[in-house]
Amino acid sequence: LMIIGEGEEVNNEVLALFRQAQQAGWSKTRFLETAAKIQGVLIPSFYVPHWNPDGTLHDLTPTHGAPARVTKRIIQDLDACYYPTDPIVPSTEIVHDRVNVELFRGCIRGCRFCQAGYVYRPVRPRKPETIIRQGIESLKNTGYQEATLLSLSSSDYRPLDEVCDGLLEYCEPRSMSLALPSLRADNFSMDIMSRLQKVRKGGLTFAPEAGTQRLRDAINKNVREEDLLHSCQVAFEGGWNGVKLYFMLGLPTETDEDVLGIAELANQVLHTWRMHATNKARGVRITVSTSCFVPKPHSPFQWETQVTMDEYKRKVQLLRESIRAKSVTYNWHDPDTSFVEAVLSRGDRRIADVIEEVWRRA
């Protein structure tokens, strides 16, 4: 049984049906046949695949009364649906060791590499009072000292000032920090930054994605170099001394000039710090991180090729040799993971054994 779309509502419907089936002693087949009538529920075993001579899928024949097409579930009112404000807190340190609160779902942008920006349409914001309540309740229940406001592009949330003020009113007396990931360099403001610096400063992260304007235009990122440098200037003038920059290697039409442009952009950020930082005694930390482009289904780049592992490693080495400033740290993602991700994301039901093998190999 698989659920297509967003699960907050349909999860409860399936679980309620499962409890009913257990209490009534239904067979597995009867349970699945009934579940298939719920919008968003896909029963793969109820569809017989037919293949083209080249191995691609021709069509699926539904059986057991299953619908010919499964319609994904979309939450229309995020304020009314369940949100876990008392999640299980792990007993060991984890990567995202903080409270996460969703600002809105979807994205007003249209980056051509981004699957999430297309599959989570339309854009649906939460009300400011809902976000503030969920954030405060989560902090109280978990004991975490940091809250992150999540979305595909946090600074595109219009009432962001109101949310920051409401959460900081609770966080500031308790020395808790508030983070805004996924900031866009073209709408980062001093007003937002002044709210964040009321408590201890977290890191600032920008994702230019590509090193040159030509390539950023090609992927529809729509962030200009002057926007990024101005945002960094605002941050450095406000007392920040650390910036993380995220890029992708292997994007369609990418050349070595684009790769070298990443190093040049990092140098420009460093120069901006030297010119505008208010506290140079602490130094500056500029972190450049790259990942390997993965062509994702349901994105405009879904049919693009992925660079070979050797080519990705060559690009990484080229960039490593180009970053010479001691204040700039370069991190890159393991290409093996990106290639597995590409295979799994573009596969069909025949990839099931591969998924199991990947899981067994951790």
Regions found by a protein language model. Give the residues of each.
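Conserved structural-core and active-site-/substrate-pathway-adjacent residues in large, well-folded domains
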Residues: 2, 41, 81, 106-107, ...
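N-terminal [4Fe-4S]-dependent radical SAM core
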Residues: 44, 50-100
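Glycine-rich beta-alpha loop elements in corrinoid/cobalamin-binding modules
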Residues: 1-62, 297-348, 357-361
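Short secondary-structure boundary/capping segments
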Residues: 2, 18-20, 118, 162-168, ...
